[in-house]
Amino acid sequence: MIKVKLVRSRIGCNPNQRRTLDALGLRKIRQEKTFEDNAVVRGMIAKVVHLVEVTE
């Protein structure tokens, strides 16, 4: 399981990064979600790695 936490604001992100955060369900700063560890989730995290904090 992977825990993803939004630590930086979505303001100033490009539309693709915003859609990725929406797909991850992260809307507010300090919001956390837990996901299964798979390639799809890892790819989404890679697109917004500068905005999130990942814990395994």
UniProtKB/Swiss-Prot annotation:
One of its GO terms (biological process) is translation. It comes from the Bacteria. Keywords: Ribonucleoprotein, Ribosomal protein. One of its GO terms (molecular function) is structural constituent of ribosome. It holds the Pfam family Ribosomal_L30. Disulfide bonds: none annotated. InterPro entries: Ribo_uL30_ferredoxin-like_sf, Ribosomal_uL30_bac-type, Ribosomal_uL30_ferredoxin-like. One of its GO terms (cellular component) is large ribosomal subunit. Belongs to the universal ribosomal protein uL30 family. Part of the 50S ribosomal subunit. NCBIfam families: rpmD_bact (TIGR01308). This is Large ribosomal subunit protein uL30.
